[in-house]
From Swiss-Prot:
Annotated organism of origin: Nostoc punctiforme (strain ATCC 29133 / PCC 73102)
Record's function text: Plays an important role in the de novo pathway of purine nucleotide biosynthesis. Catalyzes the first committed step in the biosynthesis of AMP from IMP.
Pfam families: Adenylsucc_synt (PF00709)
Entry-linked NCBIfam families: PRK01117.1 (NF002223), purA (TIGR00184)
GO biological process, one term: IMP metabolic process
Signal peptide start-end: none
EC number(s) per entry: 6.3.4.4
Name of this chain's protein: Adenylosuccinate synthetase
Recorded name of the encoding gene: purA
Source domain of life: Bacteria
SMART domains documented for this protein: Adenylsucc_synt (SM00788)
Record PANTHER family: ADENYLOSUCCINATE SYNTHETASE
GO molecular function list: adenylosuccinate synthase activity; GTP binding; magnesium ion binding
Amino acid sequence: MANVIVIGAQWGDEGKGKITDLLSRSADVVVRYQGGVNAGHTIVVKGQTFKLHLIPSGILYPNTDCIIGCGTVIDPQILIAEIDQLKELNISTDHLLISETAHVTMPYHRLIDQASEERRGSYKIGTTGRGIGPTYADKSERTGIRVLDLMDPDGLREQLEWTINYKNVILEKLYNLPPLDPQEVIEQYLGYAERLRPHVVDTSLKISDAIQRRRNILFEGAQGTLLDLDHGTYPYVTSSNPVAGGACVGTGVGPTMIDRVIGVSKAYTTRVGEGPFPTELDGELGELLCDRGAEFGTTTGRKRRCGWFDAVIGRYAVRINGMDCMALTKLDVLDELEEIQVCVAYDIDGQRSEHFPTSSRQFARCRPIYKTLPGWKVSTTECRTLEDLPQQALDYLKFLAELMEVPIAIVSLGASRDQTIIVEDPIHGPKRALLHPDGTPATLLSA
């Protein structure tokens, strides 16, 4: 039995969907613990592409229970559309469970999100405009609508009549937007409630029961460590906690129940939206990474900013999440490069630093200090073992593992399930490297 958290170790979009899909083969339960439709994951199976935002990656396995936890925020319209999409493809969603205490994104959340971002002007943070921040804000203000409220028609009518009238004042007076019709919204969401009712349960009890029965549970995060509300590049962050600690809060599982944390990183770095990005590449090289990596957001279609691998934020992610091992994705994107650079430290106002600064203003002044490695100039997409990889690619992987001080358990070389090298069992294999007295790692990727 193993209870495993899969987290993003960069700014999101690391390929968590594929890695979670791979690990779901040996999982009995897959749980999404935070975020909403502001994040998407893409899974490619036998040439067929599945793009999901709320439903966990394990949905493609009929014997795997899939749970949307209490730490998420749910847009019922989009969730129902995902359910219908899967049914059209003859994929059952009978094993999908939704937390009754998850909060619900309402139409006024989306309107306020978009209007607020527009009003920020040059201070915009790059929100997706899907209403995620305002939904979490209402949760904190204790004025939010929860899934269990949708299941109570009389209570929902009373709650929404007051809430929508209150939000209409904000929409009209602050943002000069037309008001919402309370009755129209109420009827719309009562309809959503009936569609979702068969899936709604106390998911914390379901997860607790699975733990007691010693089932394998996979906790799936959205976004990434550097987008965490408390530990990311604030204010250019999301409104929840994608870090490993968020899995406990967002599901109702005690921290002593977690056995392992797997971090997912690209072989380079991407970021979407605003905020500092020390290793960002402009010009032809950045465009090459973007094109080869198909770096366009699943949710918004926005072009992602691309740059070299940043080991400073990588080590930070290892520390903040307590990562035991790493899955490295999109190694194949680097196949055409003569040389590859890795950021090993920052120059901050003339001082060398190997630590991630907590201030975004200071982070914006960071200049990368690079180590240059030779490229391999051959395709790796057909490699299925470490022995198949060119020596320069092996050297690159070993260098990253040494910098991160965690073993690399999985190497992904394309979008399909089979384009993967399993270096070590990511569930039961080596954990975070122990250090010798001189500070050098005791166990790392060996080739």
